[in-house]
Amino acid sequence: MLRDKTQTFLLTHGIDLDPSLDEQQLIDEEVIAKLVEFSGTGDEDTVLEIGPGVGNITEGLLRRAKTVICIEKNPKYIPVLKERLKHFPNLDIVLGDALHEKLPRSDRLVSNLPYMICEAFLQRMLRMDVKSVTFIVPSGFAKILEARAGEQEYSKLSLQAQLFYTSEIHMEVPSSAYLPTPRTETCIISLVPRMSSSVADEALKQLFRQGDKHAKNALREALIRAGICSTKRQAVSFIAESDVPVETLDRRVTRLSLNEIESLGNWLRTLVD
């Protein structure tokens, strides 16, 4: 059984799992097979896996993908991965932090994503070009991503996720599928990039892709990239003549509130209607 195999790897390499650091290992072969299946991974795909741990998901991906790139923050797992998966020539192991490391180009993202980085990593994903994202995440987080305007869970994160992706929650993952058992309910969710339904939506996407710039500068670039303005001078003029509050323009994009983002979206729509 995969549980026994995992425990052997941990014991052999002297690894203690720390639940406070989201170090739960997926040990249910059926759930792993479903995760790989839902990801749509094929033999032409390069897959990026975040936080492989002892490599239980990694092994399943390696049997289907052209290449699997693993980014693991904790060095204690690297010897396990190298020993266990040494017979797979299509594996590339990277020691680094997925929130700060320059991420390699990939076709798909697959991960039992560490719970504490879910929101922060989603912000990184907004600037990535991939076919699909298939993650195991807390069920509460998945509900936020799918929440509609007016619902209690709806937030800035909901707006961003739905602007960039279509989502599907495939299945709940039983707590028995992990070692050790988590206190959080989890599920498998897939996100597929969404084509912009309007020029205004594309401009809003481009705004979010500006990272931590001040909104005024990010908005200027977004207007140009979305094709609303052809020059910086024109974009600056549009912003200067707008009714967007100075406080909003001076705020960094990552600090904008849901209300501010919705107001910016409404203003962008007036430019193209």
Segments (PLM) and residue ranges:
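Catalytic cores of RNA-modifying enzymes
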Residues: 1-206, 260-273
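An accessory alpha-helical subdomain
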Residues: 185-193, 197-267
